[in-house]
A protein has these predicted regions:
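Helix-rich terminal scaffold detector
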Residues: 1-76
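Active-site phosphate-binding and catalytic loops of NTP-dependent enzymes
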Residues: 79-89
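Short, intrinsically disordered, mixed-charge
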Residues: 42-45, 79, 133-140
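Generic preference for well-ordered secondary structure
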Residues: 12, 17-20, 24-27, 57, ...
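Non-DNA-binding regulatory cores of transcription-related proteins
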Residues: 87-155
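Bulky hydrophobic/aromatic packing residues
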Residues: 5, 50, 64-67, 72-79, ...
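Conserved small/polar residues in nucleotide/adenosyl-binding loops
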Residues: 157-160
Length: 160
């Protein structure tokens, strides 16, 4: 008897290797923690929908990357260290602070956040970025130099 066109459990898509996890502490703002939880819930809902209707090979193949993403999100959530922004000092730049940078290019406002909530378009920079590293610990009126691809800049900082 031919086995062609028979759906075997062995036909399931193989598990993908885990996504790399950062070696740095997973500091998050309350907003960042909420975003991680929402991403995990959304991915779980998508997985559940696929498991319940995974009739096609394409749907089954979509499960492997989704399972990998779920493992990564669960690991990031379990390692999250929520920083209480209200307990941060207000006289210097710290994690979670929003800072106005005054330079020859004009004023820009940046918020220093965790790795997973960084978003260049929204001026939310990871605390590990060169800009955040230059700003951390600075006080209003301090001048700091930060390394960037376009060359070093000397900027005055004012905490907002």
């Amino acid at each position: 008897m031919s086995r062609a066109f028979v759906k075997d459990s062995d036909d399931a898509a193989p598990a993908l290797p885990d996504l790399p996890l950062s070696e740095h502490p997973n500091y998050v703002t309350p907003r960042g923690l909420m975003q991680l939880r929402e991403r995990l819930a959304s991915a779980q809902a998508r997985r559940d929908a696929l498991v319940n209707s995974a009739d096609t090979m394409a749907q089954q193949n979509e499960l492997a990357p989704l399972e990998r993403d779920l493992r990564w999100l669960a690991a990031r959530l379990s390692s999250a260290i929520e920083v209480d922004l209200l307990s941060q000092p207000e006289d210097r730049v710290t994690f979670g602070a929003c800072v106005t940078v005054d330079s020859v290019e004009g004023e820009q406002r940046y918020c220093i956040v965790g790795e997973d909530e960084a978003d260049a378009e929204q001026h939310r920079v990871s605390y590990l970025s060169p800009l955040a590293q230059a700003l951390l610990g600075a006080q209003v009126g301090d001048e700091v130099s930060w390394k960037r691809p376009a060359g070093d800049l000397l900027d005055r900082k004012s905490v907002v």
